[in-house]
């Protein structure tokens, strides 16, 4: 639909919690890290690095996440885990799970990684509204400033940036729950800064109870 990821682009991927945006973007990051040998920087403000790595291992090896969490893997899953670990170890994926990170820190770390590793192929931020502001502005002003800075970072480093975003609870009050631009939480100028705004939506999310595993729920990442 988008003809792939392009340099300089800021892509906003928005969804309600539990729909699967983290799993979706991790799949993109894994494919780029493995298939193109490009460097991928992931700034995870919601989940720790260990949890993200476990999600990627489960996806890579078709392993039940509950089995991995409890250490009760089936024999075939142990073999798959070994293969998945070998595959992911070759991917140039760098995860930063610093809590309360500010945009200036993200920019500095990306510049350093690009310089030390001869470029970056993708930057992922999970998620936009958790980046700390630098002043006393209200949250809409903070998020607007952050989206502008993410776009500037994409242009400066000539790299696609995918920033995940939460949707406001207002979408739950409508009969038609398909998200629209105004549903992006503290959106401000996001739609002006982003080259692409994409939404993840599943009908079954509203038919079934969301999973209890946090952002994406379920037994598989």
Label the model's feature ranges.
Residues 141-221:
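Phosphate-binding/switch region of NTP-binding enzymes
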Residues 1-8:
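Phosphate-binding P-loop
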Residues 41, 45, 112, 120-163:
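Helical hairpin unit composed of two closely spaced alpha helices linked by a short loop
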Residues 14-15:
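The Walker A (P-loop) glycine that initiates the GxxxxGKT/S ATP-binding motif of P-loop NTPases
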Residues 18:
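Walker A (P-loop) phosphate-binding loop of P-loop NTPases
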Residues 21-22:
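Conserved lysine of the Walker
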Residues 25-27, 31-119, 133:
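Cytosolic-facing regulatory segments adjacent to core modules
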Residues 11, 94, 123-125:
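Hydrophobic positions in the central parallel beta-sheet of the AAA+
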